[in-house]
Structures are given as structure tokens and as C-alpha cells.
Amino acid sequence: MEKLTNVQAQQEEEEEEGPLSVTKLIGGSITAKDIKLLQQASLHTVESVANATKKQLMAIPGLGGGKVEQIITEANKLVPLGFLSARTFYQMRADVVQLSTGSKELDKLLGGGIETGSITEIFGEFRCGKTQLCHTLAVTCQLPISQKGGEGKCMYIDTENTFRPERLAAIAQRYKLNESEVLDNVAFTRAHNSDQQTKLIQMAAGMLFESRYALLIVDSAMALYRSDYIGRGELAARQNHLGLFLRMLQRLADEFGVAVVITNQVTASLDGAPGMFDAKKPIGGHIMAHSSTTRLYLRKGKGETRICKIYDSPCLPESEAMFAILPDGIGDARES
């Protein structure tokens, strides 16, 4: 009995370190039925409830105005709103995990790797290495933190039918990982339209709470929007839907500390931006630009080599690095 109590105490301690289960709101007039309604609305943590607007909670079928007020009050008690010093936040940032890209030069450019708890957008033309980088990250995120991994699973949403599990197996061999275990640790799904894409992100919230995931990939985030919303007449509707989708991704990154990686396509820039020698820009407009924490621009080099440029980042300087697409994933470019 004492051993069981110790196990329960350890589980509770581990739970306190991560997001709080929405079941902690049960008490008083808040019942298990109310909690189920919140979970059906993809609100699995107290943090997600505390960060939701009153309007969003009122829209949940079965929850009345009085009950919503009580839920908000209890959630704010567990997750109080307030300020912290920049020094405290600086210390918290020191613990942020970064995932290796497979290339030492690319990791150096990124200050260590792909940052967890934020959205990284990777854009470029076809065959520039976006999907190959995603496949490599799907494996490296499973490595121990001491080996520049995230010690977690990967969630992979494919919208263009480019996911290949055999590619993961080859990359797993490179890192001397068990192929079957690596494949088991990647939750894969296909999205065929933008509504499905959003629905899958809602489903992801529950999966992230139930198990340890280090990485969420959407390859590509914009492809389905380009086919579902055609012409200027649907542009406003597309951007509104896209904004909702990206806010959901940011919420998952904030709550679960997962690295969110999305790929994007480019289009010709009619005004010549970003430069007179490379008149291409990522699609998605200002909504995509402001939602992505870090934006990486990939372009082709000679042979298997590719070039990555820091297009936008809150802390990284504008710079470039060369990497290569190798049989066993992304790696450093070989000297010719």
C-alpha cells in the first residue's frame, strides 16, 4: 500500500510539472459532465481553459452563462494572470530544448536547433529540402536531450502525400535507433481539406496531453488553403480560417512545450521583394508572417546541397548556412 502511495505521489508530482488536467476544475457546481464538455471542445488542460475567451466557452453546447463564469473563476485560481521579471523569463528560456536538424552547420545557424515551444516555418520552392528536413526532425526529436533530441514522440500531419516511413527507417539506422520503435513513435495522418486540417489539430490536443510529444509537423500548412479557397473573393475567408488554425498551433506550443514545424510554399513577388536577385516570398500573407516565431528560407544549391537563410527571427541574426540532403537524412554538405 505504501509503495502504491509513493507511485501515486510521483505521478502527481510529474503532472504538476506539466500542464494541469482540466479534471482539477471539478468541485462545487463544476461536475464531471462539465469537464467532459470541455474535453469534447479540445480543452484538456486548465491552461487551455484559462486562455480561452468567455465567448469561446459560451459557444460550447451544454455550458450556460453561470457555469462558464464559475469555470473561468476556478481556472484563473489555478493559472493566475500576472507578470514576471525579465530575469525570471530569461532563466526559463535557458531550459528551452532545441532539436537537432541533423546538420551541425544548420544547428549552429539556429543557435542549437529547432526551438521547442514555438512555431518554426520552413518555406521554399519544391525540392529544396522542406519535407526531408521534416523527416529528419521526426527521428531526432526522439533522441535523448543529451544528444540534442527532445525525448518525445512526433505527430506528423501530411497534406501533400509526401510522408515516407521508409525514409524514417533509414534515418533511424544513422542514429543507431530501433527502426520499429522510431516508427511506433510517429503518429501520422493525412488531411484532405483545410477543415480536416483544423479538426486534426483539435484532436492533437488530447494526444499531447496523454503522451509525451516533442514535435508537431504540418507539411504543408498552406497547400490545402490554396485549393479550398480560390480567387480574391475568398481571400478574407481563407485568412480568417488560417488565422484560427495558426492560433491553435501556437496554443499547443505554449501549453505543451512542443516544437511546431510547418512548411510553406513560395510565390513570385510582384514588387521584387525580398530582393532584386530573389523575387520570391512565402504565401499566407501577414497572418502567416506574424504567427511564425522563426521563418527559414530554403533554396537549392549545387547537387544535393541546399542553403538555409534566417528570414525572420526574434533573436537570431540574418545569416545563411549550407547543408545537404543525404541518403540517411539531412546532414552537412561535403567539401567538393
From Swiss-Prot:
Stretch forming the signal peptide: none
Residues the entry annotates as binding ATP: G124, E125, F126, R127, C128, G129, K130, T131
GO terms, molecular function: ATP binding; ATP hydrolysis activity; ATP-dependent activity, acting on DNA; ATP-dependent DNA damage sensor activity; DNA strand exchange activity; double-stranded DNA binding; single-stranded DNA binding
Alphabetized UniProt keyword annotations: ATP-binding, Cytoplasm, Developmental protein, DNA damage, DNA repair, DNA-binding, Meiosis, Nucleotide-binding, Nucleus
Taxonomic lineage: Eukaryota, Metazoa, Ecdysozoa, Arthropoda, Hexapoda
Tissue localization of expression: Highly expressed in ovaries.
Protein name: DNA repair protein Rad51 homolog
Family named by the database record: Belongs to the RecA family. RAD51 subfamily.
Bias-annotated ranges (Polar residues): 1-10
Any one Gene Ontology BP term: reciprocal meiotic recombination
PANTHER family assigned: DNA REPAIR PROTEIN RAD51 HOMOLOG 1 (PTHR22942:SF39), RECA/RAD51/RADA DNA STRAND-PAIRING FAMILY MEMBER (PTHR22942)
Pfam family, one: Rad51
Gene: spn-A
Statement: the UniProt record of this protein carries the keyword ATP-binding: yes
A GO CC term assigned to this protein in UniProt: cytoplasm
Disordered: annotated segments: 1-20
Keyword DNA damage applies: yes
Protein task: Plays an important role in homologous strand exchange, a key step in DNA repair through homologous recombination (HR). Binds to single and double-stranded DNA and exhibits DNA-dependent ATPase activity. Underwinds duplex DNA. Spindle genes are required for each of the symmetry-breaking steps that generate polarity during egg axis formation; oocyte positioning at the posterior of the cyst to generate the first AP polarity and inhibition of gurken (grk) signaling to the follicle cell layer to polarize first the AP axis and then DV axis. May have a role in female meiosis.
